[in-house]
């Protein structure tokens, strides 16, 4: 059986109506509201074909039909047109990022709040994983007697700096030697792939500067992971519970239990981390059984070409995909630009 234009129109009408009303859709409703130019009897026949093809299904207690996960997937891949944000909504987003915020955590918090507000679902925002960023350049500069500044540049463009106390006998030539060895050994390496043997090599080559090296390596690690690692910001938890699909107490308990498990949420978001653009998981496409009654739309955010983390929206499979995709795409682009400004302006 072939998915022709008329079947597409009827499937689109069923999905739009069900997203808006959460009520099963009958042939008369489609005929009355969507003006497809065919009789209710013809619509019924086409709906019967769509059901046989697996795109719609009949709830036990209703004469109407609702989209299946396969139907939603066909809609997202073939029929969906992104929704335009209103001018007021675009201004809200722009102002949310234009306000002078220098803390990464506050920017991510705002991102979550705006996503939850604009979609009316639950928003998840993953803290950047700086452990996965690589060292690009290390420089130590003598600032005065017993004072030096340590500057660390990461491949994301993030710049970290820290004052440190050094022996009075230390010269800029000594600091240049330390910087040169650190760059030779650490450049292009992330914190997670720096092995003990490499640290031993560094100490061997800089044995007469051991005390400075102890402090420098400690500060380098502290500055890079000073932001809470792998934290997940959740906003709008109760938004999803307001959906009629989640009026069942047991269903609510299962979902709330999942949302309390930060490690599990991190794993869910990490699954799409290496994919640029927007990822949509519908119903049982989600690997976790607890959210197989839900859909998840995610997008990565980045600085330059380095992916730092993931943002996502969790809602029922009856999600307004056209709106959510528009919102999350807009937010990921704005978040990337804002983090680029913050991270590169930390000197």
Swiss-Prot record:
One of its GO terms (molecular function) is DNA binding. It comes from the Bacteria. InterPro entries: GAF-like_dom_sf, HrcA, HrcA_C, WH-like_DNA-bd_sf, WH_DNA-bd_sf, WHTH_transcript_rep_HrcA_IDD. The keyword Transcription applies. GO terms for biological process: negative regulation of DNA-templated transcription. Keywords: Repressor, Stress response, Transcription, Transcription regulation. The keyword rRNA processing does not apply. PANTHER family: HEAT-INDUCIBLE TRANSCRIPTION REPRESSOR HRCA (PTHR34824:SF1). Belongs to the HrcA family. Negative regulator of class I heat shock genes (grpE-dnaK-dnaJ and groELS operons). Prevents heat-shock induction of these operons. This is Heat-inducible transcription repressor HrcA. The lineage of its organism: Bacteria, Bacillati, Bacillota, Clostridia, Eubacteriales. The gene is hrcA.
